[in-house]
Amino acid sequence: VPAPWTDAAIVPAARRFMNMVGQVPIVVNREVEGFILNRLQGALLNEAWALFEEGYASVEDIDLTVSHGLGFRWCFMGPFETIDLNAPGGVADYARRLGPLYHSIAKARSNPKPWNEDLAGRVEAERRQKLAIDQLPERSAWRDRRLMALLRHKNTQSDT
């Protein structure tokens, strides 16, 4: 996040350096609470908690929707590139076709609820049925190995 007094040459130079060392830098044009990743993750998490709380799906089915649906695509491309490819006429076509639906969905969640202890306890109970608390370190290590394998794969592929 460049400050107002940051020299204009610093951000592109920092981006080049980060790319050179194998990182994928994100430029945040101005300060925003939570930065970019946490805000996007927060939107998805808030909807996941609400869908579970309102009885639309189980914790497992919500996780599967993300890991085998959105996450499957999003590990290679972001939301805008995804929708650009999901309509014959690209992003503008997608926005015309589905913008009203997504706007209606967003309006329905204009007053998000906090994640309360009761709800967290219910989610916790479903998760513990799938994975005992003492198995978290082993599952985390499994996740990390999978992430490293995915990273190796992505690093060997072209973006085009």
What are these model-predicted stretches?
Residues V1-I10:
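Conserved phosphate-handling catalytic cores of large alpha/beta enzymes
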Residues V1-P2, I26, W49:
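A broad detector of the eukaryotic-type serine/threonine protein kinase catalytic domain
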Residues A9-P12, N19-E31, E54, V59-T160:
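NAD(P)-dependent Rossmann-like dehydrogenase/reductase catalytic/cofactor-binding core
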Residues M20, L37, Q41-E47:
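Structural/interface elements that position substrates and couple domains in central-metabolism enzymes
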Residues G42, F52-E54:
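AAA+ ATPase "lid" subdomain C-terminal helix
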